[in-house]
Amino acid sequence: NKTILKALIDAGADVNAKDDRGRTALMRACLLGQDRCVEVLLDAGAKINDQDEVGRSALMEACIAFKRDTIHLLLERNADVNLFDNNGVTALMRAAYGGYPSLVEKLLAYGADKDMTDKQGRVALDYVREHNRAQLEPILR
């Protein structure tokens, strides 16, 4: 709830505090698509590109959950589209894996590098092929 969140911040809550897995309130809000809370947290100084213990960022969490509005909000606030997790997986690879053409196109428009490789040497196009997402092949070629 936006009102409660603002009250906590006004009372001195650390917007960049992390849980036992290194996740921040911003990451959780993005995973849940709580855009008003995302805005409040960012306005209060939440670090948009923080990563948890497995290397996931707020943008990656939003991509995993396919929260379109949240993704757009993060991109407009200059989230790094080319961050990668501990396995080298990027937001673009997650979008490709999920089979989300509009998300793949949006990430590319915001500068996602389709040639980045994960730790296994795979690029986003490999995720498309491995998971039978043929509709994405023309976008990523």
Region roles according to the model:
Residues L108, D113-R141:
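Leucine-rich solenoid repeat scaffolds
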Residues E53-R56, M60-H72:
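Alpha-helical adaptor scaffolds
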Residues N1, R28-Q34, E61-K67, R94-Y100, ...:
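Ankyrin repeat A-helix N-terminal signature
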